[in-house]
Amino acid sequence: MTKDNMALYMRVLELFRRTSWRMFSSSSSSGVRLRILPSSSCFFDESVQIKVSGLSPGEHVELQAKHKDDKGVVFKASATYQADGQGDVDLNHHPSRGGSYTGVEPMGLFWSMMPESPHKKLLKKDASGPVLVHIEAHRDGQILSQETNERRFMADGMKRVPVNEGRLRGTLFIPPGEGPFLEL
């Protein structure tokens, strides 16, 4: 193989390597990062902060939230944001410019979720499992980054005991540890 052919071969190989890497890389290969703070796992009634970084300054990005309940009903919300001068979007400070809601709404992607099928209500049959909300950052229909927020109703180690005595029906929740425990 001549020196010129070898150089051409190396350029083609490098081009193929770059192209195939883009074709098969994960959705976050764009350098865009979606984060849920302080953690992607929290209690159902806790607020989280959603941040997107790695965008171009002024770039528009659509955030989508999706949850499938225990009956298989899909709930969705979306909002369009414009990145600041550093290429960041922070739902605590930046306004949604359209979608399921507008304005500064830190938890807007959660409270504005609507069922795909009209007149359906969110159903959670078992409080021991989390509600999973999948959040994606999109540009022109392409997923740039994604994260799942696990929203729990019960602390780890909590025991759930069904009560069915005579006419009494209910559920007893027992926290981990020795006690004594508060009564309600």
Where are these regions (language model features)?
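Generic detector of bulky aromatic hydrophobic side chains
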Residues: V12-F16, F110, G170, L184
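A generic short-segment signal for beta-strand/edge and adjacent turn/coil regions
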Residues: R18-W21, S29-L34, S47-Q49, Y101-P106
